[in-house]
Amino acid sequence: MQISISLQGQSKIIYQIFRSYYENAVLDLPQDIELREFAYQPFNSDTYVRHLTFSSVDELRSFILSNVPLHLYFSAARYQIPSAKEMEQKGWLGSDLLFDLDADDICEINVRRFCSGMEILSETCDGEVREISEITVDCINRVFENALVLKDILIQDFGLKPRIFFSGNRGFHIRVDCYNEWANLDSEDRREIAEYIMSPSPPYESNSESGPGWLGRFARGINGVKIDEQVTVDPKRLVRIPGSLNGKAGLKVIEIVNDKFEYDEYLSPFEGIVAFQSNLSGKFNVLGHEIQLRRGEITKLSAKTGVYLALKGYGVIKAHVR
């Protein structure tokens, strides 16, 4: 049984840590904020609240501080009436182009199983089974390398201006802000783009690594990029707001500039230290460094690491000091 990402039964301390962050958070919002649908997932809930609208950044911030989000989104689409409950009533005005790359699709994830806090290699367990998926620096770097290839495709083959964002967990989003004919692409048009990226078919072979488009990429050993096709195909998809927190890991959704990215605890914006009580025993790879935990033992950790561990189901935070 995989650990739920819900915070039901989790300490309220994380809620307060998130709220403190949002008091001064800088959110990267579109200029046409009034045309976007907003959505969020509250703490202690597995469902989303959708069809929200805001006319200004200040109005959104006030809402966030009263309704602290575990996850926060806006729509890739623009609407005449974004608050309408039914999609056909919203009045679609076009959408940005989205791509999603996730570690699950690109790396072999190391899934470790625990029974009553101790790691097990067999299927036998008389107690609760917990599964922990460890993400390594090498894995995230591989996903990022794929994101850079996709960025190059969008620039060189389509003449677009893509932006890469770290998802705040274990992947990357690429967004192209569209305000022209690209915004009006329907699902089938977007599917063709996704297929061009995932399963390219050059008209002939070439040994020239500097050749145009997929001819050169094939010569360099690049045979396609694995993306979540459904994200690209759906013009009414929700996308994480840059500057918000990903409630699966407590890391910040950030734009990648200068094509440089490092996967470490500094992706977390939290300050101070926490008293963390582990539910598991063992050595773990956490945000690029190894950590030793013992079940039931309270350990002093940085808030950056402690919040990540708590959200991933390793244990609970007992206290936080800024």
Curated annotation (Swiss-Prot):
It comes from the Archaea. Its cofactor is Mg(2+); Mn(2+). The keyword Iron-sulfur does not apply. Its EC number is 2.7.7.-. It is an enzyme of class 2 (transferase). InterPro entries: DNA_primase_ssu_euk/arc (IPR014052), DNA_primase_ssu_PriS (IPR023639). Pfam families: PriS_C. The keyword Transcription applies. SUPFAM superfamilies: Prim-pol domain. GO terms for biological process: DNA replication, synthesis of primer. The active site is at D100, D102, D228. One of its GO terms (molecular function) is metal ion binding. Disulfide bonds: none annotated. GO terms for cellular component: DNA-directed RNA polymerase complex; primosome complex. Keywords: DNA replication, DNA-directed RNA polymerase, Magnesium, Manganese, Metal-binding, Nucleotidyltransferase, Primosome, Transcription, Transferase. Heterodimer of a small subunit (PriS) and a large subunit (PriL). Catalytic subunit of DNA primase, an RNA polymerase that catalyzes the synthesis of short RNA molecules used as primers for DNA polymerase during DNA replication. The small subunit contains the primase catalytic core and has DNA synthesis activity on its own. Binding to the large subunit stabilizes and modulates the activity, increasing the rate of DNA synthesis while decreasing the length of the DNA fragments, and conferring RNA synthesis capability. The DNA polymerase activity may enable DNA primase to also catalyze primer extension after primer synthesis. May also play a role in DNA repair. Belongs to the eukaryotic-type primase small subunit family. HAMAP family: DNA_primase_sml_arc. This is DNA primase small subunit PriS. The gene is priS.
